Every structure is written in C-alpha cells, then in structure tokens.
C-alpha cells in the first residue's frame, strides 16, 4: 500500500515524463509536493523503488524509470492532484495542525477484569519508517489489568530494529494514544507527517532522537517540527 504522498510523486513523475520525455528534477519534485527539502523526495523515491514502482539507473542524470503504475495513480483527467500531508491513524488530518479523529474506544471492560477489545489499526515499522495502514483491520482481546486509562490501539510490528527491547517482527504492540512522551519511552513517531516508526524517544537539547534497539540501525536526530508523537507503548502481544 502506497501513501498518498508516494502516489502523488509517482503521478507527477509519470505525467512529466509523458509531457517532456524526461523525469523531473529533485527540485521540481520538491516544489510539486510542497516539501521543504529534497531529503523528503529521496525518501519517497527510495520507498517507491523498494515497492517496485520505480527504478533508478546508475551514472545517468535524472535516471528514474517508472516500472509499474497502480490504478490510483492515473486520474481520469490526467491532471496532477495535489493533497495535504496524510499520516497514520491517530494523527491523520486534512491539515497538519488539525486534531486527529477519535479512534474506536476499547469495549467490554468491567470491574471484574473481563477482557476488552483493542482495535488493530495496521502495521508499524521497527526498522526503516514505513506507512501504517489507517483503517481498523480487526480487534484483539486484552485483560484490562495490562492497560491504564485512555484510548488504546494495536499495531503489527514489521522489522527488527527494536529486538534488544524485546520487540520482534510480527509482534502486536499496544499503544496508548497520546501526543507527548518522556525521554526513554518507546513511541509511535510520525516523521514529516508521512512515515511512522516505532522507536525509543530521546531528547537532545531542542532536537528529538529516535533510537533503535539494534546496533545495525542508526539513531535519527530530527527537529521537533518534523516529529509528532502518536502514542506510547504500554504492552506487547506475541503468538507462538
């Protein structure tokens, strides 16, 4: 599944190649998507390449080849459609400053410890940031003894960057929805209103560090304007 921003970039590249015969420059792509820097374009192109939609050709300027096109990329009018940044459920908005729509509440709890249902909202990366699916796919039952107050949701982990924190590929992480966290907390972090990742939060002066629990992955240090907290890890479910 591609993010809206990935789709928009693929659409723009396809139309520019159809009109001029050559791919757009990184500056043109940055301006078309209203991004602040070309690093965002690099990340989008890498994601599209990993998913098999684009191929970069070595030793050639503007060497981007479109390999395949999903139906969603080709609008009936052929026009390039702009969009506002979209993010993971728990932070998806029509504009970055707007608040997220409420998530489904946990259901069925009582004072006798009856299990409650937590919505599974998609996948989260414990590795290179990936897009998370924004719709509820199923629910998982949990004992209320493992949950504090507030709204909770679950995400399926993809990747191995948090293995030294005991979080493995395929685990379900249970997240308490909140937009703040303490240094040292493991959080769902949204980067550039586009990509979601599960990392340990560290504060370094005015910057935010997203720290992996696997020495094979580098810590990412970002400005506070580029990171939004979508929730804090409170529990983990693993099937054997």
Curated annotation (Swiss-Prot):
InterPro entries: LexA (IPR006200), LexA-like (IPR039418), LexA/Signal_pep-like_sf (IPR036286), LexA_DNA-bd_dom (IPR006199), LexA_repressor (IPR050077), Peptidase_S24_LexA (IPR006197), Peptidase_S24_S26A/B/C (IPR015927), WH-like_DNA-bd_sf (IPR036388)
Coiled coil region boundaries: none
A single GO BP: DNA repair
Hydrolase listed as a keyword: yes
PANTHER family: LEXA REPRESSOR, LEXA REPRESSOR-RELATED
Catalytic function, reaction form: Hydrolysis of Ala-|-Gly bond in repressor LexA
Protein name: LexA repressor
Listed GO MF terms: DNA binding; serine-type endopeptidase activity
Assembly: Homodimer.
Active site as annotated: 161 (for autocatalytic cleavage activity), 199 (for autocatalytic cleavage activity)
Function: Represses a number of genes involved in the response to DNA damage (SOS response), including recA and lexA. In the presence of single-stranded DNA, RecA interacts with LexA causing an autocatalytic cleavage which disrupts the DNA-binding part of LexA, leading to derepression of the SOS regulon and eventually DNA repair.
Keywords: Autocatalytic cleavage, DNA damage, DNA repair, DNA replication, DNA-binding, Hydrolase, Repressor, SOS response, Transcription, Transcription regulation
HAMAP family named in the record: LexA (MF_00015)
DNA-binding region: 26-46
Entry keyword DNA-binding: yes
This enzyme's EC code(s): 3.4.21.88
Alphabetized SUPFAM superfamilies for the sequence: LexA/Signal peptidase, Winged helix' DNA-binding domain
């Amino acid at each position: 599944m591609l993010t809206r921003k990935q789709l928009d970039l693929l659409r723009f590249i396809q139309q520019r190649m159809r009109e001029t015969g050559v791919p757009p420059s990184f500056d043109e792509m940055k301006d078309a998507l209203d991004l602040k820097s070309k690093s965002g374009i690099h990340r989008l192109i890498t994601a599209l390449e990993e998913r098999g939609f684009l191929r970069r050709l070595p030793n050639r300027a503007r060497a981007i080849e479109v390999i395949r096109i999903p139906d969603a990329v080709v609008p009936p009018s052929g026009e390039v459609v702009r969009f506002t940044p979209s993010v993971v459920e728990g932070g998806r908005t029509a504009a970055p400053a707007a608040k997220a729509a409420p998530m489904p509440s946990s259901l069925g709890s009582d004072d006798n410890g009856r299990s409650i249902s937590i919505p599974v909202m998609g996948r989260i990366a414990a590795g290179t940031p990936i897009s998370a699916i924004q719709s509820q796919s199923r629910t998982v039952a949990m004992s209320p003894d493992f949950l504090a107050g507030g709204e909770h949701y679950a995400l399926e982990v993809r990747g191995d960057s948090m293995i030294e924190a005991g979080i493995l590929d395929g685990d379900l992480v249970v997240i308490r929805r909140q937009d703040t966290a303490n240094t040292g907390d493991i959080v769902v972090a949204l980067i550039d209103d586009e990509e979601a990742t599960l990392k340990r939060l560290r504060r370094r002066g005015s910057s935010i560090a997203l720290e992996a629990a696997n020495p094979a992955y580098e810590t990412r240090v970002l400005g506070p304007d580029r990171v939004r907290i979508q929730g804090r890890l409170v529990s983990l479910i693993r099937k054997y």
